């Protein structure tokens, strides 16, 4: 069964500011079919320590911050920032 995917305005705004090559890689993950079928994407999604439902996906020097609700089968893309900033602003 496919998971529901949501995107925050902040995520979309931050994604539009990324370098072109990084943005293309983020778009492949965020808008691709793989995340709908398996949000844990065979090891690419890593749990944030100290948080039950928050995860990160590493893309070079950038990180995507996501919230996964297993009960509702919902994946919410919340932030995409450089690795030095993501842990200050997410979750």
Label every PLM stretch briefly:
Residues 8-10, 51, 78-83:
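Generic beta-structure capping elements
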Residues 13, 35-36, 40-43, 81, ...:
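Residue-level signal for pocket-adjacent positions within structured domains
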Residues 1-30:
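Arg/Lys-rich, positively charged N-terminal/basic patches that mediate binding to nucleic acids
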Residues 2, 16, 59-62, 67-91:
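Enriched for short, Lys/Arg-rich terminal
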Residues 32-57:
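A short, surface-exposed loop/turn module that caps and links secondary-structure elements
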